[in-house]
Amino acid sequence: MTEVLATTPGLYPLPDWAKDELSDLKGHQKDDLISGDEGEEITAAYDRARDTLVDWQVEAGLDRIVEGQSRWDDMLAHPLTVHENVETRGIVRYYNNNNFYREPVVRGDLSFDGDVSEELGAADATQAVLPGPYSLATLATDEHYGDDAAFLDAIAEFLAAEAEAFPPVETLFLLEPSLVTDAPDDGTDERVSEAIDAVASATASDVVVHTYWGSIPEKPYAHLMDADIEAIGFDFVSDHEGNVYNIQEYGTKDEVALGVVDGQNTLVETPEEISERVEWVDGQVPAEEFETVYVTSNTELFYLPTNKAEAKLGALAAGSKGVSL
């Protein structure tokens, strides 16, 4: 019997009241973004925002609850931009969209920080979210380790220490869009699999490596299958053909995450559409018998207005309950 669970990759839009309040408290300039040493008023505002994001998910009926990552001004680069040995420089485009983040430049050892685990501990969450080691490395600049392989290893060790400090959660989503947008070349693809292993081995939670904005090229996908993880996540909004091909050709894990809700489009899917998309994927890969199917948006949700994000959460929960596998 397949368990069908509704969840998301996290990184939610700030509630409207929080945008206004934090804008007044923080300002509007690059230097006003989160740095890890915020005062009491800003910290309290983010605490209330986190509670609101958790309430959205609980009220919608999601099966896995994230803390929402409301403090992640720099999106997936956040764990580095708040680190004491990282300098933030100019504004860089976030993948191929109209969002921007501060370039994190690593100037010293990536020692344990605890920022993400502290956020997670402050929320009643059942799912953690981290950038995958490869994506975080591609978003950053190294001025300390001096070698791409050593830098990737250091990023993996840094994330593993963070994951090891997490409070107990059911699931950890490692977000790896760069496996699609900037796929690793020969040699690097094997190291990426090992880096993901290093993070996954640090937690007892089920680990989902979630990819989006297309499908992973064949060779990196084959190496990802070697990683000791519970599930791979696929973006069936951006590239259903490429992702079906990978599963048909190389198989996948016993669990799977299906990105069937568009995290960047304000059009809200109906529960019936979501159920049908999950069942369609299952029908394309009859050789696979999944223990668990995570029904999720393909991307983070911060691209959406808050009312649309909330509506998509409700549709996700209802759609997952209507799935018949």
Describe the predicted segments one by one.
Residues 1-325:
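Domain-level signal for soluble alpha/beta catalytic cores
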